[in-house]
């Protein structure tokens, strides 16, 4: 027989605990982090005298996933009130959508302006 065959290993499978805490009677609980909702931003379209209404409806359908009826209502609000909110998003998404709309409008040679504003 080999010398190693007589060795017996015993593993402690209990969770490690400090006996000092038990003796002191102190209960310890980890602090749970509190999560807050990120600040939201409005994406706003502004009226101008040159951008066709159909183009504004197209922008609302393509970039904001609005159906034709809702896109038309928002377009009419932009036309009559001078501006309208297209959606409410976190900052990164709002900035991206505004940039995409402005870039698409410039490529299509329209002066349509889209900006973001902090909600609240």
From Swiss-Prot:
The task this protein performs is described as:
Involved in the modulation of the specificity of the ClpAP-mediated ATP-dependent protein degradation.
**Which InterPro entries does the record associate with it?**
ClpS, ClpS_core, Ribosomal_bL12_C/ClpS-like
Q: Which family does it belong to?
A: Belongs to the ClpS family.
- Name of this protein: ATP-dependent Clp protease adapter protein ClpS
Gene name of the record: clpS
Q: Offer one example of a GO biological process linked to this entry.
A: protein catabolic process
Q: Oligomeric state and partners?
A: Binds to the N-terminal domain of the chaperone ClpA.
Name the PANTHER family for this protein.
ATP-DEPENDENT CLP PROTEASE ADAPTER PROTEIN CLPS, ATP-DEPENDENT CLP PROTEASE ADAPTER PROTEIN CLPS1, CHLOROPLASTIC
